[in-house]
């Protein structure tokens, strides 16, 4: 592609996209982060983890305590047997590495600091009626005995059946302490509308140490579109809390989500055996209309 020089401002009615093309396959990827350029009709929050998130008890210590002073003010961590020390800055990638403890079903979960008035991440409502956009990038160092999930949920639980309204991506190696999937090698997209669950099996076989850029975009009709590494995928209309329906690339969105439901952004990992598992989170971002 040739370089072009402009002497005046570049104008586009619907924004710009950062596009790349895989030479071997010809597949086009939208590598845009957020909305480009940013739109004055939307509010944006972006977390690049300049500080490590810690558990709530450490964040709430008086600021004369060295551990508290070093921790992230916007995000915290929690989970079964999780401690602040289990979150480190990633050595081989950007962002943070969350590593579970070593007992079966130990967890590491990342979420906004939910104490009252602690951060705009929790004070801002990510409602289904707010045209919310969610995105994060993560990678997994190993693919054994684990469950990884990220998206917008009512609670931090990884089970499909827990939340009546939700939108999240999930990978799990087995059904232990979880629901049965038809294919445990693939990324899945789970969404629930008023207690009815839908599981889309994406044609993406999970690989180790591979960055996955997940994006969920809810439009003004409360319908969600999903993207992985800049490629849009269809969302199934077949209801079910187990198994899953295979989908392909395409533009089919969810049906209209339940109106006026405020969701919380999460990233989580749970081990499925007596061994530590980890997830590397590069960044997390959300935006919404400035007024519903």
Q: What is the meaning of each model-derived region?
A:
Residues 1-38:
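Intrinsic low-complexity, repeat-rich intrinsically disordered segments enriched
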Residues 30-79:
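Extracellular carbohydrate-recognition regions
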Residues 49, 136, 282-286:
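Extracellular beta-strand elements of beta-rich domains used
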Residues 190-213:
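Short, aromatic/His-centered strand-loop micro-motif at the edge of beta-sheets
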């Amino acid at each position: 592609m040739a370089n072009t020089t402009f002497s005046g401002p570049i104008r586009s009615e619907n924004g710009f996209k950062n596009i790349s093309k895989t030479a071997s396959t010809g597949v086009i990827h939208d590598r845009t982060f957020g909305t480009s350029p940013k739109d004055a009709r939307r509010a944006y929050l972006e977390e690049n983890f300049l500080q490590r998130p810690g558990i709530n008890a450490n964040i709430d210590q008086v600021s004369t305590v060295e551990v508290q002073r070093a921790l992230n003010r916007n995000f915290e961590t929690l989970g079964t047997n999780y401690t602040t020390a289990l979150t480190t800055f990633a050595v081989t990638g950007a962002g943070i590495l969350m590593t579970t403890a070593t007992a079966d079903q130990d967890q590491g979960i990342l979420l906004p600091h939910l104490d009252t008035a602690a951060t705009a991440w929790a004070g801002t409502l990510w409602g289904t009626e707010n045209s919310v956009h969610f995105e994060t990038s993560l990678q997994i160092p190993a693919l054994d005995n684990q469950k990884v999930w990220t998206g917008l949920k009512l609670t931090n639980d990884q089970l499909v059946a827990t939340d009546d309204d939700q939108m999240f991506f999930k990978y799990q190696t087995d059904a232990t302490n979880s629901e049965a999937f038809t294919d445990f090698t693939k990324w899945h997209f789970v969404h629930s509308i008023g207690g009815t669950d839908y599981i889309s099996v994406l044609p993406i076989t999970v690989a180790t140490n591979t960055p996955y850029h997940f994006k969920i975009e809810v439009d003004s009709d409360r319908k969600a579109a999903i993207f992985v590494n800049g490629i849009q995928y269809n969302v199934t209309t077949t209801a079910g809390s187990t198994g899953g329906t295979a989908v392909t690339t395409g533009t089919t969105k969810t049906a209209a989500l339940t109106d006026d439901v405020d969701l919380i952004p999460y990233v989580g990992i749970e081990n499925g055996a007596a061994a530590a598992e980890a997830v590397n989170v590069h960044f997390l971002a959300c935006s919404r209309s400035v007024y519903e």
